[in-house]
Amino acid sequence: MRYLFLLCALATSAAVPAQNVKVTPLGTHPGELCSRDRATIFEDPSGLRILYDAGQSVQGADDPRLGTIHVVLVSHAHGDHIGDMKLKAQGAGSCDNPELVTAAPASTSGEIAAAKNAALVMVGPMANFLAKKVETINRKATPNCPQANDTMTAPFAASCVAGVNLGGARVVKLGDGKAVEITVVPASHDSTVPRALLSEEERKHLEADNVSLQLGQPTGYVIRFSNGLVAYLTGDTGMFAEMKTTMADFHKVNFMELNLGYSALNAPAAAHIVNDLVKPATVLLSHVNEGATSGGKVKSGTHTADFLALVKGRPVYLALSGRTMELDGSGKCVAGCAAP
């Protein structure tokens, strides 16, 4: 009888699907954190797959690492996030200076959304801009994402647009799976779009006065996954008070993907955000604008190393390309947790 109970228990545990969120950075050089690395895929336990900031470190829609994508997120319209360029090939060029080719006029985000029938979830002006790119690729209008009871259900029949105002949210689920909530939150940055992605007429108007076109407000995201993980994706940003009041106090985030990027955030400021404002259980460091690693280990004398030395009381992992980490509902890394 005891053996029968054990067998039943084992069978039951084997039938329960994994309850971890899988996080996979897609960079330019396998196993490294390099200067142009931006893209990250988040896979909910339900199977819903979200691509965040495709940028320039993917090879466009044909990148074999992408797999199924249900939702495309873009934090702001800078070329390294919306994707005015794309990676020529995995490992092309150096980690500091990868070899890129143009992704104009479509952008990597537009290409991928069109090819994967993905929902564009972002602030309205940028969602509409990318919806037009998808329309050009598909040769038909990009519809609004269908909803029932304020919930979008993937997979979608075609790429669709789901614009969100700052502070608003979209709820998405895969089939009959549990829902994932995606909230658009502030960032302290700008959101100017590369002229290469604009029409010739628009470029001429802007070039005459050397001005830029901004596609709405720059943002970050808070994603509440079905296992309880609450992830804060900062986007490009400086420090601001809502990191504590909104992200920590209200959303109670327990995981943070932090963009370092010295034009917006230096190591001491970034460490203060982590240690004193947001206080997540775990940090994933990305967008470092330097070849930060060699053999997957952080190089001394880098801004990345400076930041790591200042963070206290929680693990920081590097967004090493192709290395999947798994996070439980509390924000703890439980698999693929390589030390920097």
Please identify what each model-predicted range represents.
Residues 11-13:
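N-terminal signal peptide c-region/cleavage motif recognized by signal peptidases
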Residues 18-19:
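Boundary of Sec targeting at the N-terminus
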Residues 28-111, 191-212, 237-251:
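Pre-active-site segment of Zn-dependent metallo-hydrolases
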Residues 31-36, 58-59, 78-83, 122, ...:
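Active-site environment of divalent metal-dependent phosphoester hydrolases
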Residues 42-45, 174-176, 223-227:
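Active-site beta-strand termini and strand-to-loop segments that position acidic
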Residues 51-55, 69-85, 121-124, 232-237, ...:
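Active-site neighborhood of phospho(di)ester-bond hydrolases with catalytic His/Asp-centered motifs
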Residues 111-176, 271-340:
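Binuclear metal-ion centers of metallo-dependent hydrolases, dominated by the metallo-beta-lactamase
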Residues 209-268:
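Metallo-beta-lactamase
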